[in-house]
Amino acid sequence: MVDKIIFTVTPIFSIPPRSAAAVETWMYQVAQRTSIPNRIACIKNEGYSDFLMVNDHCSVHRIGFSRLYKRLFQKWTRLDPLPYSQRILNIAKDFNVTDDSVIIVHNSIKLYRQIRKRAPKAKMVMHMHNAFEPDGLDQNVKMIVPSMFLKKHYQAYLPNADIAIVPNGIDLEAYQKNAVPLQKSDLGITPEKKTIFFAGRISPDKGVTLLLQAFEQLLKVRNDIELVVVGNYMSKSKGEKAAYQREVRELAERLKPHCRMVGGVTPEEIYNYYSLADLVVIPSQFQEPFCMVAIEAMGAGKPVLVSTRGGMTEFVKEGDTGFHLQEPMTPESIASDINKALASPDLNDISLRGQRCVEEKFPWEKVTQRFEEVVNNWFK
């Protein structure tokens, strides 16, 4: 049986995250619920402390690097005397890990390799949330993924790997007790208007411009719809993503006053926004490994219209728990699919079935239970 766990992740977001960060959210939600004593090792960003005691069996240890240190050792000389991977192992050592302890690396094959090189005998698990090429991973690696789609992806590269499915989850209390639902009037939308809703990254892989173009088509034939887009459309990104966000802003400006760009919201706030939606559209252009927005929307009792690319169709079943977008996706096809979904006589029943599906399969408590079963079975 596993006696202690170190959860860690690539040094981008601090934990708990203050913006949309599905990987770090999974770590924080499961770590605080599991009965296995654990420490989370992550980067320390501005505004965070070095340490957070979550409860009596979970704590967060944030690894900070000064600007001078990063400039001197990580940028100029690239001779880092105390790299992130070693600092994680130092946290593990301070935790008095034993031969029955496990290090779980989230979504960074590079970090997994670095830790494995420094601790070749450590018990380790690779937890992948996205589809990458697993260069340099052990052929018999133990891996957790959120969907059958992602399991098949990695099995094709690593046929001898031991791969288990542990899905993502949602906090049902956030909907049922803690949410303060927004009203359409809060955004200047009249109650009779049908609100199309999108939440996620404003990036090409999420298909935001396609949705905006589809909405433009819809406005030509109906005057009872509005579009709400939640996501950071003014990020500090450069290059292709910056150009894409500029295109999104220009399209949204053209669609005013019927299109509202809300901007980014925190993971805690997003639960208040789904109340605005009559239909949540997820037109992902890439192979979506799972999609947190889909289960969040379904958990809020909202109908979803999703891309069939990737893992979403494992729980969004056409005509049962949601609706599927036609392929190939075009502005015209998405507009048609939105019209069909909104006109469906089974819309409310489908929404209820989607909500029940999420309540039965994806509460964080059930995700944590499944996680414990997997790791304890691997390391008996």
For each feature predicted by the language model, list its residue ranges.
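N-terminal strand-loop element at the rim of the active site
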Residues: 9-17, 33-79
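Nucleotide-activated donor-binding/catalytic signature segment of Leloir-type glycosyltransferases, i.e.
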Residues: 119, 240-265
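Conserved donor-binding/catalytic core segment of Leloir-type glycosyltransferases
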Residues: 189-206, 212-216, 227-230
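Short hydrophobic beta-strand element within catalytic cores of glycosyltransferases
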Residues: 303-306
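A short helix/loop element that forms part of the nucleotide-sugar donor recognition site in Leloir-type
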Residues: 176-189
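Short alpha-helical donor nucleotide-sugar binding micro-motif in glycosyltransferases
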Residues: 264, 272-277
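A short, well-ordered alpha-helix in the C-terminal region of glycosyltransferases
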Residues: 346-361
